[in-house]
């Protein structure tokens, strides 16, 4: 099978980072912990959002991968599956930070995957909408966390929703919820 894997929120934990770092940075309490976008989590302006990522982007992208991601991905590879990293990272960096650019984000992601021992057959940098690439690479399962992407992708293939506060209410046909990387492995092995 062809397995697509998102980065932010799937390989790299995002929800708690935004809440913990945002609470300190903005000196505010969380307004809505079930939102994907930090602007809505803290009810902040686009300018405040950009300032946050200017300061925090490198700290965020340099953190280690989610526990067992590497281990499970290697097990999937050993079982003959092709692994595609499909990410919007590095396609619109200028929209939220001046600290790094798209090229840096792409180059650093490749380095980060290597540092975290994350196996892949190919890395696909795509715009926020991933459906065209999912169709092109005939992805059987896409592991995704962003609510909008989960819904769009579920129209064309199976989505393993990496569960988070912000996507708990996203349900539907072709959407299977997973709570950990070993949970993901069990879902794929079952099919």
Model-assigned labels for residue ranges:
Residues 6, 86-88, 143, 162:
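Short hydrophobic segments within beta-strands
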Residues 51-58:
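Short glycine/proline- and acidic residue-enriched helix-loop micro-motifs
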Residues 14, 87-90, 146:
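Short, well-ordered beta-to-alpha junction loops that form the rim of enzyme active sites
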Residues 20, 92, 168:
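Flexible, glycine-rich phosphate/dinucleotide-binding loops
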Residues 22-23, 76, 113, 134:
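Hydrophobic alpha-helix position signal
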Residues 1-51:
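Active-site neighborhood of HAD-like aspartate-dependent phosphohydrolases
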Residues 81, 98-191:
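C-terminal cap/substrate-recognition subdomain and adjoining C-terminal extension
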Residues 60, 69-108, 126:
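Substrate-recognition element of Asp-dependent hydrolases with the DxDx(T/V) motif
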């Amino acid at each position: 099978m062809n397995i697509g894997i998102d980065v932010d929120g799937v390989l790299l934990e995002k929800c708690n980072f935004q809440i913990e770092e945002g609470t300190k940075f903005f000196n505010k309490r969380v307004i809505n912990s079930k939102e994907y976008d930090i602007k809505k989590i803290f009810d902040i302006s686009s300018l405040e959002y950009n300032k946050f990522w200017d300061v925090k982007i490198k700290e965020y992208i340099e953190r280690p991968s989610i526990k067992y991601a590497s281990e499970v991905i290697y097990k999937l590879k050993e079982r003959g599956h092709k692994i595609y990293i499909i990410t919007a990272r590095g396609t619109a960096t200028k929209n939220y930070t001046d600290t790094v650019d798209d090229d840096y984000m792409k180059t650093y992601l490749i380095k980060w995957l290597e540092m975290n021992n994350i196996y892949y057959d190919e890395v696909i940098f795509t715009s926020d909408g991933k459906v065209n690439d999912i169709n092109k690479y005939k992805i059987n399962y896409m592991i995704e966390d962003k609510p909008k992407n989960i819904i769009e992708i579920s129209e064309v293939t199976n989505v393993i929703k990496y569960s988070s506060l912000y996507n708990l209410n996203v349900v539907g046909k072709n959407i299977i919820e997973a709570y950990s990387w070993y949970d993901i492995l069990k879902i794929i092995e079952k099919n």
